Amino acid sequence: MTETTLGASNELLAELTAEIVAAYVSTHVVPGAELPTLIADVHSALNNATAPAPVIAPIEKPKPAVSIRKSVQDDQITCLECGGAFKSLKRHLMTHHNLSPEDYREKWDLPADYPMVAPAYAEARSRLAKEIGLGERRKRRGK
């Protein structure tokens, strides 16, 4: 800040402090001995409020252990956090990284339909379920 701007800033700060203290004292009983402390507290609060906010460095995005494109293979799905290969990621994410599938997708900017299970494993489970009759209506017994 230049000296002119700094001087104007200090004058404005003093005026605001005086207005706030005057308004407070007009509605509250303040002993004379506490008045300098009140003025100093109000001035300090205003000075801190007008100080520029600290600049926060942008957060760098984490780098995945493997590329997102290579993480989904037919027989396995690779964890972007640690690089481990799994048939199903959901339990691994919760136990080792404390992440839900939604948190994992959000952290790595993955689409909502990003699989948590290897495609071949999902197909095998689906085929097995159909073979044992899951998903079909039960047949009624004749009475």
UniProtKB/Swiss-Prot annotation:
Recorded coiled-coil stretches: none
Origin species: Sinorhizobium fredii (strain NBRC 101917 / NGR234)
Keyword Isomerase applies: no
Zinc finger annotations (C2H3-type) as residue ranges: 79-97
Protein name, entry field: Transcriptional regulatory protein MucR homolog
GO molecular function: DNA binding; zinc ion binding
Cited InterPro entries: ROS/MUCR_sf, ROS_MUCR
One record GO biological process: regulation of DNA-templated transcription
Keywords attached to this entry: Activator, DNA-binding, Metal-binding, Plasmid, Repressor, Transcription, Transcription regulation, Zinc, Zinc-finger
Functional description taken from the UniProt entry: Could be involved in the regulation of exopolysaccharide synthesis.
Similarity remark: Belongs to the ros/MucR family.
